[in-house]
């Protein structure tokens, strides 16, 4: 899950095979989007934020309940450009964490953006294009194109970010080892 208050990326990926021959299959990818109805309000919480949080929370719960994943990776928040955007990021992360914790008793891990990028691409500062290319190469890219049909290119990056965490080989190794027990 790539959390946020404007865009939340979700990728459900099946990890199969035996180490080191790991296969990744896209099950579902979505981007849930909201925007304020009344413009910027100086960083205060209002009824409009409650509407947005409620929509994103129920959307995440729905995906988690539908697929019942063995492991949920939740991207940690990273630096923000302003106090307002930092507050929005914190709200988005908190709502995603609450949705995960209330919908499942399975394992959930928080993944730092820098660590995920370094493990997946070899570079902590990997750009959006490199992340997208890695995910398409490792997970069936055609399926991503189909799943995200109608989603603006600028918003697709959130689904790719969510997939990046699961498409890491170290995460796959842990999942496969646990299933073998």
What spans do the regions from the language model cover?
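Phosphate- and other anionic-substrate recognition elements at nucleic-acid/protein interfaces
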Residues: 1-181
């Amino acid at each position: 899950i790539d959390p946020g208050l404007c865009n939340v990326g979700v990728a459900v990926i099946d990890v199969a095979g035996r180490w080191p021959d790991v296969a990744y299959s896209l099950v579902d990818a979505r981007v849930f989007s909201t925007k304020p109805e009344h413009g910027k309000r100086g960083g205060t919480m209002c009824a409009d934020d409650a509407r947005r949080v409620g929509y994103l929370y129920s959307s995440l719960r729905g995906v988690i309940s539908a697929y019942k994943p063995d492991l949920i990776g939740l991207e940690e928040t990273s630096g923000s450009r302003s106090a307002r955007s930092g507050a929005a990021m914190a709200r988005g992360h908190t709502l995603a964490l609450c949705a995960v914790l209330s919908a499942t008793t399975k394992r959930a891990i928080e993944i730092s953006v820098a660590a995920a990028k370094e493990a997946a691409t070899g570079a902590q500062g990997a750009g959006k294009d490199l992340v997208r290319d890695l995910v398409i190469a490792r997970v069936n890219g055609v399926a991503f194109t189909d799943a995200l049909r109608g989603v603006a290119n600028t918003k697709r990056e959130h689904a790719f970010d969510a997939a990046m965490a699961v498409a890491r080989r170290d995460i796959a190794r842990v999942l496969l080892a646990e299933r073998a027990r």
